[in-house]
Amino acid sequence: MEVAAKLSGARISAQKARLVADQIRGKKVGEALNLLAFSSKKAAEIMKKVLESAVANAEHNEGADVDDLKVSTVFVNEGRSLKRIMPRAKGRADRIVKRSCHITVKVADK
């Protein structure tokens, strides 16, 4: 049995979120949550909430035991980008791209 949780439009770039996703992929849920709790990255806090949601979905919907669950799949896709303008000297302007991403975490009991 495989259960998923998804967060759409997380306000962090996909590149930064993938660094954290690579750390927890394939690990047991308890170990992954512990790793995320002590990470200093912004993406770790976001990823922890999504993982906890996936675990809660597995418990509530499938009646799974938390000790048997492991992170089977984690992937991060690019979301919408907000384009902003930063005024510069001599009438110029630079474009600022505020990136977002979609995070999907799947947990399985095998």
Swiss-Prot record:
Keyword Ribonucleoprotein attributed: yes
Gene Ontology terms, MF aspect: rRNA binding; structural constituent of ribosome
GO biological process: translation
Keywords: Ribonucleoprotein, Ribosomal protein, RNA-binding, rRNA-binding
Superkingdom of this protein's organism: Bacteria
Keyword Ribosomal protein applies: yes
GO cellular component: cytosolic large ribosomal subunit
Biological role: This protein binds specifically to 23S rRNA; its binding is stimulated by other ribosomal proteins, e.g. L4, L17, and L20. It is important during the early stages of 50S assembly. It makes multiple contacts with different domains of the 23S rRNA in the assembled 50S subunit and ribosome.
Family designation: Belongs to the universal ribosomal protein uL22 family.
NCBIfam families: rplV_bact
Assembly information from the UniProt record: Part of the 50S ribosomal subunit.
Protein name: Large ribosomal subunit protein uL22
Organism from which the protein derives: Pseudomonas aeruginosa (strain ATCC 15692 / DSM 22644 / CIP 104116 / JCM 14847 / LMG 12228 / 1C / PRS 101 / PAO1)
Source taxonomy: Bacteria, Pseudomonadati, Pseudomonadota, Gammaproteobacteria, Pseudomonadales
